[in-house]
A protein has these predicted regions:
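Active-site-proximal beta-strand elements of phosphoester/diester hydrolases
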Residues: 200-203
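Glycine-rich beta-to-alpha active-site loop
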Residues: 98, 103
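N-terminal beta1-alpha1 cap of cysteine-dependent amidohydrolase-like domains
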Residues: 1-97, 108-115, 119-156, 161, ...
Length: 279
């Protein structure tokens, strides 16, 4: 992300992400913000995978909504940069792994939407915002149930205890994505794109658990393994065109809502404004 420090504009990255990837043989490259689309594309074409870390809230205009009073800080340039990288990666079938904000970015890039503040929009949900410094980043907060036929289950099994540091969540699920894990209150905790070699996002922070939790390490390993593999040959024929049409349809017409119990679980709902990147 970008940040001001003693009058300087800095790009910063949590070292835990870098160490988690480097330990498994990856060569992490931090992509600068504020770049032209052409320059950003030049960097993208040299990558083998895209990792999307946690961070600020995503500007709701990207999924056709007004700002909620409890929306947190946003970063316009980071939103723009990550949306471009994510959409390009999904179009190409390049492996993608998203953490916390990262899974939300994957969803928005595919035409989905977010709850801008979980507890004000649904008071019946459990607490998910165990933020530091009040809580340790590695604090186990709840369990997730993982779909047994998912890529995530291959890494983490069918049930897993996770940390939780978010006040937003997945609402309308984007095109080509499937909810593959839920918290005990029904809130989506992970998404993946079954048609692609590896496109997975989780709402928790596995990098904070990886030192003592082999299953969290497995998730990073599977991403690195996919990035080093022959993913360029695995994307389905016609996927780019299919994705563009599907993403546009979802963002215009609504789609399956993700949660159980408190919200609709199926059907076309509303007509949110078109996401700018779905074109």
């Amino acid at each position: 992300k970008s940040q001001r420090f003693f009058g300087l504009n800095l790009f910063i990255m949590n070292q835990t992400y870098v160490r988690s990837l480097e330990a498994l043989g990856a060569l992490p490259v931090m992509v600068p913000l504020h770049m032209s689309e052409a320059s950003l594309r030049g960097i993208f074409e040299r990558l083998d995978g895209v990792f999307l870390p946690g961070g600020e809230d995503i500007d709701p205009t990207y999924y056709g909504e007004e700002r909620h009073p409890l929306l947190g800080a946003t970063d316009k340039e980071r939103d723009r940069t990550e949306l471009l990288l994510t959409r390009w990666a999904i179009e190409e079938g390049m492996p993608v792994l998203g953490v916390c904000r990262g899974v939300q970015m994957i969803n928005v890039a595919c035409g989905g939407s977010l709850f801008q503040d979980l507890h004000s929009e649904d008071p019946d949900l459990d607490k998910h915002d165990y933020f530091p410094p009040s809580y340790e980043r590695y604090r186990i907060s709840h369990q997730v149930d993982v779909e047994p036929d998912s890529r995530l289950a291959q890494a983490m099994g069918h049930k897993h205890e996770v940390n939780s540091m978010h006040h937003q969540g997945i609402d309308r699920v984007g095109y080509g994505l499937r909810v593959v894990a839920r918290a005990e209150d029904g809130l989506p905790e992970a998404l993946e794109a079954p048609a692609l070699p590896f496109a997975v996002g989780v709402q928790w922070h596995p990098e904070e658990l990886a030192k003592t939790d082999q299953m969290s390490t497995n998730l990073f390993y599977n991403f690195v393994y996919a990035a080093a593999g022959d993913w360029r040959e695995q994307a389905p024929a016609g996927w780019r065109e299919q994705f563009a049409l599907g993403c546009r349809a979802v963002s215009r017409n609504g789609a399956v809502y993700a949660t159980n119990g408190h919200h609709a679980s199926s059907g076309v709902i509303g007509a949110p404004a078109e996401v700018p990147q779905c074109n």
